[in-house]
């Protein structure tokens, strides 16, 4: 069987920052972020332990690690949003997501991270809905990227990130006929 690893890595493609980020695009991204907990829960809750411990692609994370990664990543994103909203271009703290995915909590049942995702996305959604259009121009400095990023870009990035990992699970389920 011929496996397209690039497709398995990026089933919806890599994130592409639009040349112009409109307020409509921001609102669409907010809707994706707010709906992510329900979508990921629907995708993973019927899976068995064996299925949860199946990598979504050769050499990739298991579904369990992916769910825990989404909780970790989105908690960091939410914290970065709050920093950018309350400080002037704060420098954020990068982290090694692959190393985090190997820590002991990555072996926990997924319910812990699903609960975090649900609660945190509720809070994030409230903050996003409260933001004025000009708030999305606020920035934080990413030391690894060596430049500041606007919250408008970041909200689109995390909408993509949500759909990206949800697609990993959905494509695995389809490929394996689960």
Stretch-by-stretch model annotation:
Residues 39, 43-46, 50, 80, ...:
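Amphipathic, soluble alpha-helical interaction motifs
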Residues 2, 26-30, 86, 127:
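A broad, low-specificity signal for short, low-complexity segments enriched in glycine/proline
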Residues 21-57:
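Short, contiguous, helix-prone interaction/anchoring segments in small proteins
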Residues 31-43, 100-138:
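Acidic/histidine-rich alpha-helical segments that form the ligand environment
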Residues 35, 45-48, 73, 112-113, ...:
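Generic serine detector
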Residues 22-26, 103-110, 147-151:
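A short, mixed-charge helix-start or loop-turn motif at secondary-structure junctions
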Residues 1-12, 16, 52-98, 139-178:
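Short, contiguous alpha-helical
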Residues 27-34, 64, 68, 111, ...:
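A generic "alpha-helical surface" signal
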